[in-house]
Amino acid sequence: MLFEKKKMLSASNKFIQDIHDLPIEIKRNSIILIGPMGTGKSTIARILAKEGNRIPLDDTEFLKGLYAHQQEFHNYKNFEFGLVGTVLSTLKKTSVIDFGAGHSVYRDEKLRRQMQLMCAEFSNIILLLPSANKEESRQILLERRNIKLGSHKDQDNWHFITAPDNYELATHIIYEKGKTPKDVAEEIESLLRNKGSMEEER
């Protein structure tokens, strides 16, 4: 397990270098969606991507070539880290990438720091949350996913809501309460259009 972690940390240096070498347009225009379970990342990614390139990180069929290596890892978080690094460092064109809830959150401080470095060059990392109030977000997601309070899924999602990782990675936070997935997608598009206009004026 220790060797496996060291292997991932070593691989992350190559991921970071390969991401640095990606065309600037890919890093500037791609959209990464992060957030707890039940925030609609996949649905919103499909709307944003339209007919463009969408990469769903928790879709085992879509990424079956990468998921085929899952059994080689004793620690699933090391596999998730490697999956994220591989996908981000090999992007061929502007994409909409929806992370699974755990892909952006790591209890291991070294992996967490390396994830920050891997994501640092991407301009549009959108954290989706129901509400700015963490407890309200928890209650909304419990009802939305029909999850029992205190269950393992609830505990996992509470960790995803409260852990600092997502807040540190995000370039923007979108609160979804009272909005449809289409509303959220349009808000993201408007946000990025305005951001692009401001950058052009500089």
Please place each PLM-identified region on the residue numbering.
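A glycine- and Lys/Arg-enriched "phosphate-lid" helix/loop adjacent to the NTP-binding pocket
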Residues: 119-168, 172
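P-loop (Walker A) phosphate-binding loop of NTP-binding proteins
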Residues: 36
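Hydrophobic anchor at the beta1->P-loop junction of P-loop NTPases
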Residues: 33
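NTP-dependent small-molecule kinase module
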Residues: 2-26, 47, 51, 124, ...
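Conserved lysine of the Walker
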Residues: 41
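Short glycine-rich anion-binding loops that position phosphate/pyrophosphate groups of nucleotides
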Residues: 101-104, 131-133, 179
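Conserved substrate/cofactor phosphate-moiety recognition/catalytic segment
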Residues: 46-89
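Glycine-rich phosphate-binding loop used to anchor ATP phosphates in small-molecule kinases
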Residues: 77-120
